[in-house]
Amino acid sequence: AIASSLFGDSCRFIRDSGLNVPQSRLVIEKPIGKDKLTAIEINNKIAEVFKENQIYRIDHYLGKETAQNIMVLRFANSIFEPLWRSRFIDHVQITCAEHLGMEGGRGAYYDKAGAARDMVQNHLLQLLSLIAMEPPTDLSANSVRDEKVKVLRTIRGMGPEEVRKNVIRAQYTEGTLGSKTVPSYRDEDRVDPKSMTESYVAMRLFIDNWRWEGTPFYIRMGKRLPTKATEISLHLKSPPNVLFQKLPGSTESNVLTIRIQPDEGMSVRMLSKKPGTTLQNLCCGELSLL
């Protein structure tokens, strides 16, 4: 992989080698810089060589089968669209948990990036955009992009006090994962022993628009966690708890889970009567959709 700081020079070398012809296409992926200013600078350097219609800024998470299925789930099935709003959804969780630490010398890159830059500002915000966007006018890349941008622009901003209330950053410590002893983040190869870079980040976001006003979106990502999974879960609000309020299990709510990896699929958690001759308690069951 080429560091994004070299994108501009690489583009000039391509041009000087005579390889930039009208049918040429440039494919780039994150990280594009380390902040807004460096991202603008890199994009400007690329634009000196390539036209916008030659440039493809990609996110490989969007190539995952279940991620591609989100728009179909939402907009091709009338059972979901009426419920897909703050009136019925209590909160949304987007989780990416990884077993891996800094294997393969990845510490040199990761210690300069961290969990937020490495995963949240690209992969997880892409998933959030697919969950929260309005229906595009068509399935063209520009139309889908425009609706995603609307979502990102309506994410509520945070000042220092809001960050303290809504964001957590952490590092993993020495411990065991399965039967293997693993070092702390600061003891990993090619990581600064005094590093303040986060290997775990969690945040609560709000989208200030008509559909999602008041519904929190919880995003979390971490390394060296006991479970390896990337998934989205939409927790629906519970119905008025009148009929079954005295029964065990009645406080559970319906949850739609979209599993991105490793086991792709979708399921709905639903309540039902526990088998038996009397109505003693309720139990949760998973209805697989995909």
Regions flagged by a language model, labelled:
Residues 1-28, 32-290:
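Secretory/organelle targeting and membrane-embedding segments
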